[in-house]
Amino acid sequence: MKLTKLQNIIFPSQKRFIPYTRMFYYGEGMEQSADKEYWGIAEYHAVDFAAYFNSFSIKKWMKYTKIDNVKICLTMKGSFKIRISGYYMNRGPFQEEVLSEESFSLDEKQELILDIPEMSDQVTIVGFQIVGYKDCCLYSGYYATEIAETEKREVRLALATTTFKKEDFILPNIQLLKDEILNAEDEMAKNFYVHVIDNGRTLNKEELECDHLWIHPNPNTGGSGGFSRGIIEANLQKEPATHVLLMDDDVIILPESLKRTYRLLTLLKEEYKNHFISGAMLYYERMNEQHEDIGYVHDDGSYGPVKHRLDMQRLDAVVRNEEPWAKRKNQYAGWWYCCIPTTVARLDNLPLPLFVRGDDVEYSLRNHAKFITMNSICVWHMGFTLKFNAAMELYQVHRNSLAIQAASGICQNIDFAERMRKFTRVELLRFNYNSAELLMDAVDDYLKGPAFFEKPNGEQILKEKGAKNEQFEPLSKFKNIPVDLDTVYGDGPRGRKEKFIYRLTFNGLFCPDFMLKKEPAVIAYDWFYAPHRQYLRKKLLAVNPHMQTGAIRTLDKKRGKELLKRYRKTFKEIEQRQKTIRKKYQDRRAYMTSYEFWKKYLGI
């Protein structure tokens, strides 16, 4: 049987990864040679490769694929010892199970093929450690398996990435894909395709296109339109793709993640062939920190990761990430890196036209998706942590939440309308009138029915709603207001009298001005609700502690009363019309997810 490569051993060759070497290996005393031919390990120094990118998730590989053996193949020279170990969690701390140890003395460069021995069923990941003795040189390495060619699946993997004027990201990524995959002389190069959906229509087709890579100018129809176009092109290419990998444009990628995805697909067992491979999103700003590999819709209608944040420089996190986690209701895969078989991603099963936000959630839930995740299959995404965009989070997310629930019958345990009602009330109580309007706009537009979504006006709508975003200035502009950034996310206790007056007067909306305090109170700018801090104030300073910016909010009794009247009318209307409007979305969903619809919508 032929030796088939599963994972390459990789090193932090790019400058951006130098501060994060512990994602690749642990230990000191390893340096790359001047000619970059090998990595030298100093005498009596140990380097451990049981790290995020170089450990092997053996339990998952054995579960999901047809392999029944794994080997470590290392090209080395010199004197050294290799220890192979397995790791697993044991009621808290991780445990190491030493599987083998062997010393070598090689006068010439030589490839070693080491069998990974049998291990206990508890072992989740395996890795290896090299202890250098004399002139120890590591040239390259990989994990492999012996398997018959007839056991492999035919895979044609099409990457579809949607971009909108983000050349700083998309152009380097295109070049990386050409250099590392498309121009390689191997099996994957023949079966890998790239569709760049150019929503901004700013990329030069003639300069960028090559064999197996296409630029598709597209109207700006957001992620939904871009990824729908990508799925369409993957299905219609000369040799139709077996899988389409949806990926954001503003990400940092490692080609090795794509290679591991491809190899995984070629070896999947029959019962897992329709699973989605959900790549993890790590923070661009803190590259060692994993934000999410699978998300879920919480019972309160919010969205978030199944797992808590994990520091992938820590071995315990690397092990824990591959252990089973409690399954949540309404799980989904984010489209920063999501590989879907075209038995699911078909021309008659395209995304809903939501422009942005919620399309990936709806698609996973509509298709009852099951997921495979794995260490090192990931991207780094920027901008998730520092800025709250009200037009996006309050209007777009909530409008789409109502629409996907209505159209696809998902998340029936969640009352999105009630969530929006509560949030609207909170925004009115803290004088954030534009945000209250955005939430009610979301309800109003949802109530217009599916015809509203069938018009390609997403860009214009988001621009109009974006004009309602709060305008922040540096905190230096508010020197007369004392701000403690460490206590912004905090609130004091409230007594019965304070609660009663707060509710009775709607936090000052229905009380005389002499009862209101003139000094502005400092509150958090985003989701955090602090009724005690904002109690009976004329002004509030909403602070973003991450960016050290703020915005003044002022009690406006006239506008507040008008919006309160609209608030009562809006949420009464959705309560009365919900059953009827849901039926309209349900009846129209098949058309809105069809090739016929998307051809017209995209003008192709």
Pin down the residues of each PLM region.
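Conserved donor NDP-sugar-binding/catalytic core segment of glycosyltransferases
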Residues: 256-305
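Short, well-formed alpha-helical segments that are part of the catalytic scaffolds
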Residues: 166-185
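A recurrent flexible, glycine/aromatic-enriched loop bordering the glycosyltransferase active site
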Residues: 308-338, 388
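Active-site donor/metal-binding and catalytic loop motifs
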Residues: 140-149, 374-391
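Short beta-strand-to-loop acidic/aromatic patch adjacent to the donor-nucleotide binding site
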Residues: 239-252
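Conserved donor nucleotide-binding strand/loop of the catalytic core
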Residues: 207-225
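Terminal low-complexity segments of carbohydrate-biosynthetic enzymes
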Residues: 1-121, 125, 399-604
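Donor nucleotide-sugar recognition loop
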Residues: 333-337, 342, 346-363, 371-379, ...
